């Protein structure tokens, strides 16, 4: 009910208000900068016919303007475009290596990516056997780029727990 009242108030005397707005005097142009004002006055005094050309309405241009027809359509919303692109999946997949940790139900992994379990495994293998698990071999094995593997090996390390016995106390030996 409130929408009907609001619509009636909004549309009340709409045509008269529109006509009044159209017939209202247009705002005057902004004042010119003093440095250009002298140049304009000089040009107007040397060429008085320009003043008449500026104020004259061109009937030919007005008739062409009346023939202009504009047909517009709403653009496709960006949400629809994003939805269409989000549905596409990468075409190449590979199966995950070693299913010893089935914490997550990963069916396939896009080429060029690895799972967390695989990342920890390859970091541990490289740490334990750096001669056999080189960056080149890891890149071939997991279908990764060489530069990404080098960065992974350089900046990421596996979690280690080291327990140091307190100084001054001897560690309790196990029986």
UniProtKB/Swiss-Prot annotation:
GO MF, one example: calmodulin binding
Q: Which UniProt keywords apply?
A: Calmodulin-binding, Lipoprotein, Membrane, Mitochondrion, Myristate, Phosphoprotein
Does the record bear Mitochondrion in its keywords? Answer: yes
Say yes or no: keyword Membrane present.
yes
Which post-translational modifications are recorded for this protein? Answer: Phosphorylated on serine. Prolactin stimulate serine phosphorylation.
Q: What is its main location?
A: mitochondrion
Highest taxon in the source lineage: Eukaryota
Q: Which GO terms describe its biological process?
A: defense response to virus; mitochondrial respiratory chain complex I assembly
Q: Where is this region: Disordered?
A: 16-37
Q: Name one GO cellular component term.
A: mitochondrial membrane
Bilayer topology reads:
Lipid-anchor
Database matches in Pfam families: UPF0240
Q: Which residues carry this modification: Phosphoserine?
A: 35
Cellular compartment(s): Mitochondrion; Membrane
Q: Where is the lipid attached (N-myristoyl glycine)?
A: 2
This molecule's function is given as:
Involved in the assembly of mitochondrial NADH:ubiquinone oxidoreductase complex (complex I). May be involved in cell proliferation and survival of hormone-dependent tumor cells. May be a regulator of breast tumor cell invasion.
Quaternary arrangement and interactors, per the entry?
Binds calmodulin. Interacts with NDUFAF3.
Q: Which family does it belong to?
A: Belongs to the NDUFAF4 family.
The entry's protein name is NADH dehydrogenase [ubiquinone] 1 alpha subcomplex assembly factor 4
């Amino acid at each position: 009910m409130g929408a009907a009242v609001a619509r009636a108030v909004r549309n009340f005397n709409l045509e008269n208000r529109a006509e009044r707005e159209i017939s209202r005097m247009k705002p005057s142009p902004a004042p010119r900068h003093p440095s250009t004002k002298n140049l304009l006055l000089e040009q107007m005094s040397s060429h008085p016919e320009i003043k008449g050309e500026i104020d004259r309405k061109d009937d030919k241009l007005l008739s062409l303007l009346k023939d202009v027809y504009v047909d517009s359509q709403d653009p496709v919303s960006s949400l629809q475009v994003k939805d269409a692109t989000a549905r596409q999946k990468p075409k190449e997949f590979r199966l995950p290596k070693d299913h010893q940790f089935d914490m997550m139900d990963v069916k396939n992994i896009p080429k060029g990516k690895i799972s967390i379990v695989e990342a920890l495994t390859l970091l541990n293998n490289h740490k334990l056997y750096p001669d056999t698990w080189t960056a080149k071999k890891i890149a071939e094995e997991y279908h990764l780029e060489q530069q990404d593997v080098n960065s992974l090996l350089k900046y990421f390390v596996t979690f280690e727990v080291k327990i140091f016995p307190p100084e001054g106390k001897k560690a309790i030996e196990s029986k």
